[in-house]
Swiss-Prot record:
Pathway: Cofactor metabolism; pyridoxal 5'-phosphate salvage; pyridoxal 5'-phosphate from pyridoxamine 5'-phosphate: step 1/1; Cofactor metabolism; pyridoxal 5'-phosphate salvage; pyridoxal 5'-phosphate from pyridoxine 5'-phosphate: step 1/1
Co-factor binding details: Binds 1 FMN per subunit.
Pfam families per UniProt: PNP_phzG_C, PNPOx_N
Organism: Neisseria gonorrhoeae (strain ATCC 700825 / FA 1090)
Protein name per Swiss-Prot or TrEMBL: Pyridoxine/pyridoxamine 5'-phosphate oxidase
Any GO molecular function: pyridoxamine phosphate oxidase activity
Record function comment: Catalyzes the oxidation of either pyridoxine 5'-phosphate (PNP) or pyridoxamine 5'-phosphate (PMP) into pyridoxal 5'-phosphate (PLP).
Tagged with keyword ATP-binding: no
Keyword entries, A-Z: Flavoprotein, FMN, Oxidoreductase, Pyridoxine biosynthesis
Length: 210
């Protein structure tokens, strides 16, 4: 399949240092708010990349559930491939892509588990069927067919018809950033790239060549 001619010239916006907040979390919140207001498809979807014990990278899309002064929060099964990778090598890279705005954001940092209380609170906010699924799915494990999964979810529902507690193998992670890069597409591939690096407890802002 020849894909050489699939290209687009970016021209919607530009990103100057004067446009950027001093703190990258504040800058991210600005861009995320603009993505939401622009009705970008799945604005909180983010690719999370991790590296397992053999040095093999793996990545997938998850949904960002919170951003705060500490970092970026998502939830998952701790026994999944990403969960096992993050336990062995507690660093991750995240990429947000908002093509409607010709923007992407890269985040790198150390990963830690959220406090159980916070995971409990979020789990309680999930729809009932989603809570059943968290118990039924041995995420990333091979299963013989979908019927097995459906039957397990039904069994959990019979056991917990009203209240589904959080499984001990399910909860939140926070990516505590030490690098955040903002990318804005520009004409002639002369894209704007503004990077923030954490150095001695403070953020350094610098422009990168595209």
């Amino acid at each position: 399949m020849d894909l050489h001619n699939i290209r687009e010239d970016y021209s919607k916006r530009e990103l100057s240092e004067a446009d950027c907040a001093d703190n990258p979390i504040e800058q991210f919140e600005r861009w995320l708010d603009e993505a939401v207001r622009a009705e970008v498809n799945e604005p909180t979807a983010v690719n999370v990349a991790a590296v397992d014990g053999r040095g093999r990278p793996n990545s997938r899309m998850v949904l960002l559930k919170e951003v705060n002064s500490e970092g970026f929060v998502f939830f998952t099964n701790y026994h999944s491939r990403k969960g096992r990778s993050l336990e062995l090598n507690p660093f991750a890279a995240m990429t947000f892509f908002w093509p409607e705005l010709e923007r992407q954001v890269r985040v790198e940092g150390r990963v830690g588990r959220l406090a159980e209380k916070l995971s409990d609170e979020y789990f309680e906010s999930r729809p009932y069927q989603s809570r059943l699924g968290a118990w039924a799915s041995a995420q990333s494990e091979v299963i013989p067919n979908k019927a097995v999964l459906v039957a397990k979810a039904a069994a959990v529902g019979l056991k917990h018809p009203l209240h589904v507690p959080r499984p001990p193998h399910w909860g939140g992670y926070i990516v505590i950033p030490d690098l955040i890069e903002f990318w804005q597409g520009r004409p002639s591939r002369l894209h704007d790239r503004i990077q923030y690096r954490l150095l001695d407890g403070g953020w350094i802002r610098e422009r990168l060549s595209p």
